[in-house]
């Protein structure tokens, strides 16, 4: 007798006639007049539960089996048999069922066997993984993460663990969480009355990182091809379906690479990870297509077979102006494209994923390479039908004098970036990279619109429960 996951039984990897044990939680219990109970046992290894057929001849049938409710944890031992009923190919004919844990009060159990609103599930985030929806999201999230690591490994990239605590503002926007051990009720002060951060833990101001990019560049300029994959933080007071204060980012950096090189990398990576989900999580994707977004599977299949379009920002503005479409946000050269503009380009005009390149320098970060026209930088956004921007990237500015000028132009102190500037002083090379918001990616794949529902414990303004 061996302990096996539910998925092995349902997919036929446990031989018919073999004796196995499965462990999990009760989804439902149905009793027949013939003295047989059908207990659906779920262990999270796949979307569907396994049906255990329990006969009333078991010694604990009356006292325990007939009292099982949704959420009880059980260990079921039995024989794998072909299922005569619809809905599953295999089931277990139980020879023993051990109740590991009871639900204290089934009437008040927060995850009772009914459909719950997505808003309610956020209030019980510690229990919501037990639902079909969040369980499926968790498995897809895992598959996407593994596919990302696998893609980069197969293509010769090294994973770099960049720091979560930093003294640098990658985006130059100032929306950072401060890290401090100072006593807020007794702050040390300088002669001018400012907070004296030299007395703080790090001897200077420190923050939670908004991006691993700058640190990633240091390793790209030694190992050639690297990527970071970890949490990032933005103290942006935005209560929208697209924003989180804590989220995960995938950020490759490539030495000797142009903007076009990383645009090609982005296309290759997205198609790889989407195909992995289609291949490995068909059961979960079927659920999303049936219950969340009927286009979920077809959207990914179209994506992996599409050729990416490419367009300069200036030409994209002309396309929008000539569209005859009435947008909520006015269109003019110099604006940052809004979601409605991005989706028009991807869904209506190109009808395919599109890479928009060469944005105005005034709406982009200091580290992006200045183009010869002096007005634009070598930046790109990958726009996907159905969501808009899914990746943002650029060729990095490798010329020290130009980088210094950009820092000054944006009011940033170049001394704070002394180590970043050193990369331009000692064997500088053209290099490029991009950032992919992992939760935005999961939202696109699953059709779950709010990013708060695709991360285990969302962190948003005035919300840090659990």
UniProtKB/Swiss-Prot annotation:
| Complex formation | Homodimer.
Q: Name one Pfam family in it.
A: tRNA-synt_2
What the record says about family reads:
Belongs to the class-II aminoacyl-tRNA synthetase family.
Which GO biological-process labels does this protein carry?
asparaginyl-tRNA aminoacylation
Would the keyword Cytoplasm turn up in this protein's UniProt record? Answer: yes
InterPro entries assigned to the protein according to its UniProt record, in alphabetical order: Aa-tRNA-synt_II, aa-tRNA-synth_II, aa-tRNA-synth_II/BPL/LPL, Asn-tRNA-ligase, Asp/Asn-tRNA-synth_IIb, NA-bd_OB-fold, NA-bd_OB_tRNA
The name under which this protein is listed is Asparagine--tRNA ligase
Q: Where in the cell is it found?
A: Cytoplasm
- Entry keyword Aminoacyl-tRNA synthetase: yes
Catalytic activity entry: tRNA(Asn) + L-asparagine + ATP = L-asparaginyl-tRNA(Asn) + AMP + diphosphate + H(+)
Q: What class of enzyme is it?
A: ligase
Bridged cysteine pairs (disulfide): none
Q: List GO molecular-function terms, semicolon-separated.
A: asparagine-tRNA ligase activity; ATP binding; nucleic acid binding
Which species is this UniProt entry from?
Yersinia pestis
Query: Where mainly located?
Result: cytoplasm
